[in-house]
């Protein structure tokens, strides 16, 4: 079970010059909505508050879900909101050689898995019945010792340590100390999917390392993924960024607001006043920022120091 502890006050002064790169990493599955705007705003504000660079990376590695033209719409919406990125936008589909190289580096820790989703689900159900509900969250290791006769390799999985258990911990700037036993709570996880696409965990770690990402600000729905990414960073010899996971926007049913749960695009070509009233100001309020403004420049001039104050109040700057 992912555990969180009370935030620890920062006792070391950080050199602001070291905070260089923070990414915003949208999926091109549709236009931006309020939930994705909150994540974009938090990462943008954090970059500006620390005098760093804000990078945009289109995470289009999941080809089946990509929507034609969505990446251009996302970039245009960011600019209309006054969020201009530094450097060139990158696309994951242009970086597959980096993922190939990382997989080669992990060769001794990766094995082929021939399990279908149904087979994994059935195994997890049996384990849950024997050992309790938490067992259903862990890959049962069916193919760890080799493919059974007649099985065809589908996905590639990364071995996690068996004994002793491997507990990965980190200090999240928003949530405090977070720990996860990836051996017993996750198990061996996929780095290349059965459909041939690269798994999110591997692609994002490789890209963060290649781009020199120092700080990651994103939604709390990805908090559970972070220990796996830290483990991959260890194996690949990559530095660990700082992490800050902001709350996610929920719909009326208590589900994460997303394209799959009916989130509506906020940028429909309306003017700046509508963007402020229906997108930027609500996103800022959701993040806990008391900001008022009647223009984009005024909004950002107020939002950046408000973000600094919020983080200092939380001992998270």
In which residue ranges do the predicted regions lie?
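Phenylalanine-focused residue identity feature
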Residues: 16-19, 24, 170, 189, ...
């Amino acid at each position: 079970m992912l555990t969180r502890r009370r935030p620890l006050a920062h006792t070391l002064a950080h050199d602001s010059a070291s905070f260089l790169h923070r990414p915003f990493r949208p999926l091109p599955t549709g236009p931006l909505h309020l939930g994705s705007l909150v994540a974009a705003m938090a990462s943008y504000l954090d970059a500006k508050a620390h005098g760093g660079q804000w990078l945009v990376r289109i995470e289009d590695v999941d080809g089946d879900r990509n929507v034609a033209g969505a990446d251009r719409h996302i970039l245009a919406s960011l600019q209309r909101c006054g969020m201009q990125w530094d450097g060139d936008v990158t696309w994951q589909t242009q970086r597959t050689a980096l993922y190939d190289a990382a997989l080669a580096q992990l060769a001794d820790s990766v094995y082929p898995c021939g399990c279908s989703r149904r087979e994994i689900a059935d195994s997890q159900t049996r384990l849950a019945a024997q050992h309790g509900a938490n067992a259903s969250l862990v890959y049962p290791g069916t193919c760890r010792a080799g493919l059974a006769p007649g099985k065809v390799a589908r996905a590639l999985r990364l071995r996690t340590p068996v004994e002793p258990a491997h507990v990965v911990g980190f200090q999240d700037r928003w949530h405090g100390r977070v720990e996860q036993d990836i051996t017993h709570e996750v198990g061996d996880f996929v780095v290349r999917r059965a459909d041939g696409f690269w798994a999110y965990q591997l692609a994002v770690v490789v890209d963060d390392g290649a781009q020199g990402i120092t700080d990651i600000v994103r939604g709390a729905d990805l908090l559970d993924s972070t220990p796996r990414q830290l483990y991959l960073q260890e194996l690949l010899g990559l530095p660990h960024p700082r992490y800050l996971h902001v709350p996610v926007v929920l719909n009326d049913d208590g589900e994460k607001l997303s394209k799959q749960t009916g989130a509506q695009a906020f940028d429909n070509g309306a003017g700046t006043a509508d963007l402020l009233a229906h997108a930027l100001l609500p996103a800022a309020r959701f993040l806990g920022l008391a900001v008022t403004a009647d223009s984009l420049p005024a909004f950002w001039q107020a939002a950046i120091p408000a973000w600094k104050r919020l983080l200092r109040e939380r001992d998270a700057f």
